[in-house]
């Protein structure tokens, strides 16, 4: 055991012999002069860790990479003593000496090099000697324990960041005679809360006090120049800049969150760029009468600035100069000539602003985002409403546009949701993209006769617009130009129109028909998609590019089907022979349940049947080559697909997108679909009559049947019980528990249906004890029953729109209990009135014939969300 212990001690002693004692591997002295062989300055380190320099003249400069001869001993150095005679301390001489506690500098010292004492974390105080003329960049940067500093009056050249990021520095004495404070000199010194600027000071460098804790400031009359961001982000609460300052640069006092008042002395001709931007507590500003210009971003993002007096001498307002301020009122001098882009944008409290007539230069987005602005006037000299001028002014109700204006810029009135009407001058020839996008309250609009061109989405989303005439000078309708104009019910297109862009009328849900001029040679895809009430598209016979077949838009050659009107009567459609391609969104939102494609079909484009959720059966030919992405809704009711080709060929069609159809769809291979037609079942049903689509729908859906044999009796009476029975069938004939108070229900076939309708609140009877099941249902009664079914059974609110019944000569004769339901049914297009030589009459108490009831039921079906199956279709 003793031998083992001895061996361990021997090994340890050998290892310790290899480890040098403190400074043993470092020279304890040496030369570091900048002159000749360097012997003009010598250095020594004593056992206490004091590094002493002696000699005359300049010390050598070093770099962070090269290091100093004493560098490896840096962490052991406790003090630095530079003796008299030495004139220059070299760059990086004491860089990152974390334990140095004191520095003694001689009166002979003239300059201190770059980063000489940077990151000396132990240094707490520093007295720079009089006679020092130059401080290099970052000389004392990040001396984070430094608390007290004296700056001599003799400094002439001060580098950047000399005392920046000294987080503990709180006591600074600037000697009289000092003329310049360097760039970023005290930047980031958050404990520096007070400082007295000497009367000799002339220049405050860029960012000199940036992000310091300064709370008070007195600028001496001697100061003539304050450079950019000099006091940015300080804790100042009040500032007065005297007129003796001749140069005040950008953002000098920006981001001072505690600054409440600011005075700019007489003599200043401009408020510099960003001078007070983001001063979030600023409330009071005093400007000089000598002022001529308020520059870019001068007061931007000062939300508490609610009022300001602008001198009459001001002629120019820069970009975003007052954006995002809290100003409620603003009076611009009559001599104003220039207003920069977004000068008054995003001011949530500004309600009104008058632009003087002298303005000749008007930037983009001047009022954009002023959410409280209700009215504004524009200068008579204006020839263009620039881009985004009033964009997102959600409370703007009126604007007077001068007659001199010839063009409306991009997004000029975008999202002005309260704008109800606007008078466009006769001279306007161009309205750019999205100029009136989402102006939801705009109900009246007369486009100028001189208009020649429109931009994409120029009037998209104007959901209140009801009628529109496009002037003859317009040759092209660009993409989405009137998209989502949901109330647009009347449209006149110019006779010389040559093209209709993609989605031009997409979402115009109130248009029932559209006539395409013979001159049109180009129609973009989706031009007429998502038009819920569109029943027919018309094209003249002389059009060389397009044709319509039974209201459906096709190319002149008949090879591409471009648009199927979503509200075209009928639930089935046989695509015409010769069609090879179904265009993108061609059947958007259609109420079709059955579609059969011709043998010529090759391609169904992307989203061709988007939102055609009522589809239940499709018939494809064997030659089909492509079915586009999301051509059919995955969540549709499609239950059967008939395909003329093989199972392998079908797999090749759908393999790239496994869920083009519902997962439970049944595919019938090498066969086609046969669907019975009402005209083939009943001898008194005419396939060309106005009521045929409704009859065909109700028969195929099992909602109505014949009255015996091959007779349907279209003009026969529809009873109250029959209507209730149809809705009961539509609901899947749910189980009924309980009865009714009605004593006149004598037949068995309608007992459950009427009990169900009574218990669900769909009907209430003609009295407390009678229902009159065999009485003919009147037009107003069927309206009440259908609206009740939508609300009580389907939980759907169809009451958003109500028609004005006074438009009908007999509108006043509608019973009070039925008035709302009839107004809703008319607005929804379920009841349209009967045309006579004396006008269009509602005939509310008139009986609804079977063909009328069938048509109303089909229209109702297109509006409600209810699953339905066709009664019968067979494979052939």
Tell what function each PLM region has.
Residues 25-99, 116-118, 586-588, 651-662, ...:
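Surface-exposed repetitive/solenoidal architectures
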Residues 9-17:
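Bacterial N-terminal signal peptides
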Residues 90-93, 113-116, 137-139, 159-162, ...:
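Consensus positions within tandem repeat domains that build extended binding/scaffold surfaces
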Residues 1-10:
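Positively charged n-region of N-terminal signal peptides that target proteins for export
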Residues 50-56, 75-88, 98-111, 121-134, ...:
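Structural signature of tandem-repeat unit edges
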Residues 16-28:
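Sec-dependent signal peptide cleavage junction
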Residues 242, 674-692, 700, 705-752, ...:
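Feature responds to low-complexity, polar/acidic, surface-exposed segments characteristic
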């Amino acid at each position: 055991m003793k031998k083992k212990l001895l061996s361990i001690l021997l090994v340890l002693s050998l290892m310790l012999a290899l480890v040098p004692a403190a400074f043993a591997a470092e020279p304890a002295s040496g030369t570091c002069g900048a002159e000749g062989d360097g012997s003009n300055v010598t250095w020594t380190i004593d056992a206490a860790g004091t590094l002493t320099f002696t000699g005359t003249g300049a010390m050598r400069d070093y770099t962070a990479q090269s290091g100093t001869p004493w560098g490896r001993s840096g962490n052991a150095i406790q003090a630095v003593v530079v003796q008299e005679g030495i004139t220059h301390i070299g760059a990086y001489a004491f860089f990152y000496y974390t334990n140095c506690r004191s520095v003694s500098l001689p009166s002979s010292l003239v300059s201190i090099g770059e980063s000489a004492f940077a990151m000396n974390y132990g240094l707490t105080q520093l007295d720079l000697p009089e006679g020092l003329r130059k401080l290099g960049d970052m000389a004392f940067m990040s001396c984070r324990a430094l608390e007290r500093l004296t700056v001599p009056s003799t400094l002439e050249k001060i580098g950047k960041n000399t005392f920046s990021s000294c987080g503990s520095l709180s006591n600074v004495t600037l000697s009289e005679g000092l003329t310049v404070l360097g760039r970023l000199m005290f930047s980031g010194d958050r404990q520096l809360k007070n400082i007295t600027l000497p009367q000799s000071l002339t220049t405050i460098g860029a960012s000199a006090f940036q992000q310091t804790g300064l709370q008070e400031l007195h600028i001496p009359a001697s100061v003539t120049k304050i450079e950019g961001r000099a006091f940015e982000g300080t804790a100042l609460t009040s500032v007065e800049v005297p007129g003796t300052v001749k140069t005040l640069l950008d953002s000098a006092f920006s981001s001072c969150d505690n600054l409440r008042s600011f005075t700019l002395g007489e003599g200043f001709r401009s408020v510099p760029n960003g001078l007070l931007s983001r001063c979030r507590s600023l409330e009071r500003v005093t400007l000089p009468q000598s002022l001529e210009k308020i520059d870019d971003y001068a007061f931007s993002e000062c939300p508490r600035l609610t009022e300001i007096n602008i001198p009459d001498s001001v002629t120019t307002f820069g970009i975003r100069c007052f954006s995002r301020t809290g100003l409620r009122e603003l009076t611009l001098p009559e001599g104003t000539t220039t207003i920069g882009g977004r000068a008054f944008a995003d001011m949530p409290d500004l309600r009104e602003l008058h632009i003087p007539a002298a303005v000749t230069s008007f930037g983009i987005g001047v009022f954009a985002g002023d959410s409280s602005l209700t009215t504004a006037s524009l200068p008579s000299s204006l020839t263009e409403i620039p881009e985004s001028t009033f964009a997102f002014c959600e409370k703007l109700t009126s604007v007077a546009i001068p007659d001199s204006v010839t063009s409306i810029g991009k997004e000029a009135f975008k999202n002005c949701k309260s704008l109800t009407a606007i008078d466009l001058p006769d001279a306007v020839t161009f309205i750019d993209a999205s100029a009136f996008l989402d102006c939801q309250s705009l109900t009246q609009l007369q486009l100028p006769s001189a208009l020649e061109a429109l931009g994409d989405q120029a009037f998209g989303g104007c959901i209140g617009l009801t009628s529109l005439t496009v002037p003859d000078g317009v040759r092209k309708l660009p993409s989405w130009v009137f998209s989502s104009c949901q109330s647009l019910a009347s449209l006149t297109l110019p006779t010389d129109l040559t093209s209709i862009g993609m989605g031009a009328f997409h979402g115009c849900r109130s248009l029932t028909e559209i006539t395409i001029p013979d001159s049109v040679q180009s129609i973009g895809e989706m031009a007429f998609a998502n038009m819920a009430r569109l029943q027919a598209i018309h094209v003249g016979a002389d059009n060389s590019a397009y044709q319509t077949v039974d209201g459906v838009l096709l190319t002149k050659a008949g090879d591409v089907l471009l648009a199927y009107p979503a509200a075209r009567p009928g639930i089935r459609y046989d695509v015409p022979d010769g069609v090879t391609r179904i265009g993108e969104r061609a059947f958007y939102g259609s109420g079709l349940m059955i579609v059969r494609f011709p043998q010529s079909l090759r391609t169904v484009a992307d989203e061709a049947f988007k939102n055609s959720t009522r589809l239940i059966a499709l018939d494809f030919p064997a030659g089909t080559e492509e079915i586009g992405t999301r051509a059919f809704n995955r969540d549709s009711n499609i239950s059967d697909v008939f395909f003329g080709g093989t199972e392998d060929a079908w797999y090749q069609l759908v393999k790239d997108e496994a869920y083009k159809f519902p997962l439970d769809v049944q595919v019938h291979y090498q066969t086609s679909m046969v669907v019975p037609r009402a005209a083939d079942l009943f001898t008194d049903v005419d396939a060309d009559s106005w009521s045929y689509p409704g009859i065909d729908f109700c028969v195929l859906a099992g909602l109505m049947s014949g009255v015996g044999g091959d007779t349907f009796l279209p003009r026969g009476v529809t009873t109250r019980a029959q209507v209730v029975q149809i809705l009961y069938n539509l609901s899947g004939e749910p189980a009924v528990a309980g009865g009714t108070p009605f004593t006149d229900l004598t037949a068995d076939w309608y007992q459950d249906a009427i009990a169900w309708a009574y218990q669900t609140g769909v009907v209430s009877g003609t009295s407390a004890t009678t229902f009159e099941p065999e009485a003919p249902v009147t037009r107003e009664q069927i309206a009440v029953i259908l609206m009740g079914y939508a609300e009580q059974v389907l939980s759907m609110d169809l009451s958003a729109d109500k028609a004005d019944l006074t438009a009908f000569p007999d509108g006043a004769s509608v019973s009070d209990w039925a008035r709302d339901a009839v107004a809703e049914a008319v607005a929804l297009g379920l009841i349209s009135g009967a045309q006579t030589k004396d006008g269009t009459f509602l005939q509310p108490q008139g009986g609804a014939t079977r063909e009328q009831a069938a048509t109303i039921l089909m229209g109702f079906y297109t509006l409600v969300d209810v699953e339905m199956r066709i009664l019968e279709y067979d494979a052939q």
